[in-house]
Amino acid sequence: MFLLTNRLALSNLIKNRKLYYPYTLATILVIAITYIFTSLTLNSHLDDLTGADAIKMVLGLGLGIVALSSGIIVLYANSFVMKNRSKELGLYSVLGLEKRHLFSMILKETMIMGFVTLLLGIGVGALFDKLIYAFLQRIIGEGTGLVSTFQVRTIPIVLVIFACIFSLLVLVNGFRLLRLNPLQLTKDGLKGEKKGRFLVIQTLLGLGTMGYGYYLALSVQNPVTAIISFFLAVLLVILGTYLLFNAGTTVVLQLLKKKKSYYYKPNNMISISNLVFRMKKNAVGLATIAILSSMVLVTLVGAASIYAGKKDYLASAAPHDYTVTGTNVDVTSTQKVMDDFLSQSGNQVNRKTEVTYLYFGIKEQEKNKLTIFSENERKVLPKSVFLVFSQATYKQLTGKDLNLTSNQVSLFTKNKILKDQKSVSINGQNYQIQESLNDFIKGKVPNIFTTIVSDYSYLVVPDMDIFKESIKGTATTQSTYVGVNVKDPTHEAKKNSDLLDKLTDKEMQQLAGQTTGVPGPNLTANSRYDVEGMLNGFVGGTLFIGIFLSIIFMLGTVLVIYYKQISEGYEDRERFVILQKIGLDDLQVKQTIRKQVLTVFFLPLIFAFIHLAFAYHMISLIVRIIGVLNPDLMLVVTIIVCGVFFLAYVLVFVLTSRSYRRIVSM
């Protein structure tokens, strides 16, 4: 019996090769991608790249997601294969094979599949490893080089991950054998789906959960809380999608059946009857396609937007080659650090900016009346942030005079309510808004709050000392900023950055010994070289992961579509043969097939685009934290991604529908 199950395991894989080809290809690809991610994560050459820590962190997180996604894809493909082999397994049982023999046969099939796919997958991964590393270097802005990245410890990690996945396959398939008797196995692949219960309640529940998920996605305004809300919204939308496909589609089909003028036409009757016959199975598959498609779109839109927006973020976060920023320190300390740096480095200055300003958070806002947090009050994330400049500083930055009087201010604001106001009250002090300004600090002074809150304002006051006195006792912070552009910013950039850090630390030690107040003084140094390196590492790594996750999600989408077409093609073949025998011609058969396939497989695409439309606001808030500050750019990226995905989806549809037509026409 041992030799018999060996022969059967091998012959079954050959005989069912049409089912196993896409399954094997998908498994090889996910193994290769997992190998590449593991190899890159362990790659010692990453330390040589700028922003190495950010790249390692992103790749490490990506590896976990890739491993989980790979397991889901393999399990899903296996479920379709085993479903279509139910009749075959039942026949073996009727012919005398016991369940333990069947289990032994399936175990050996899985071992053969595992050995072949792991061998080929690791081989493909190792083959493309150098090329993918060069691609990672390219997208993070480093010089490319095909450096050997082979790590011996990569293979055991990949083997352990997929040993767990294949072991789970064996358990799932074994459980399937245990719970079904031979007669059930022979009929399992052919039986229709039971009509669901409480369909109207499920439909309403689906609409409710999806609607609330959409509401969460649209109502969140804070980028920090958006991440938490995003996961809750995703769970609700996934649940709502499954409920609507499971119950909502059946309710709609039942309503169409009651509409006699529509239903009693050959093409419509056949399509609707086929869908109703197996709606529960269709519902799970279609909802899965919709969710996977949404994942592809959201992942690509987010990753591509982050990558496309990095130049805008760099210009905002690092407007100068070298900067020193101080809080609760006199401007002379900030200037001293920069002067010492320029003296010791020998850099020639092209442009220099020196600014002192205040910033504070708004606790409450009632129309144009604003309340600042008090000095000893426990802080929470503010509703809005204000940066306050004197009119002398404004003239220094813009070259323009405002000529403000004692009760006048000028304002640039992202606050929708304040944009239409002629006056503003800050802690009970009223000011007339003389002029609405453009963003006058962009490219000159970094605003660190743009990635935290979308509601921020720049206030210009006639005299900074008088204004500070008017808000005495509130939680305000004085900041000083000195930034310089040098003649040759690329010359010894790393050495200069280290020197600036060293001088800043030295000045901080002196200030710490002179000051005992709380909060204490703080000085930080930055260089565009460091910021750009960290940004390229994080953004490039994010895009890299986004591309490969999208490949995995797209692979899952294609697999689900293909296996649905193939499995339903075999199920429908006998029914279409009967219809042809009772008078349905080939043209009517093709029209019926086309209509059914169009309805079934473009419905998930419509849902995916709707999901993306409602998730767009939340995605824009989340990527804002990472530095995407240009909404127009993100919109263009989204349109391009949707267009490319639509074309890919149509291509998959065309190829799989041909397979379906070929099967039912046999």
What are these regions (language model features)?
Residues 112-256:
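Hydrophobic alpha-helical segments
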Residues 313-314, 320-325, 331-555:
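Basic-flanked hydrophobic alpha-helices used for secretion and membrane insertion
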Residues 18-45, 53-90, 110-124, 202-204, ...:
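Hydrophobic alpha-helical transmembrane segments of multi-pass inner-membrane transport and secretion
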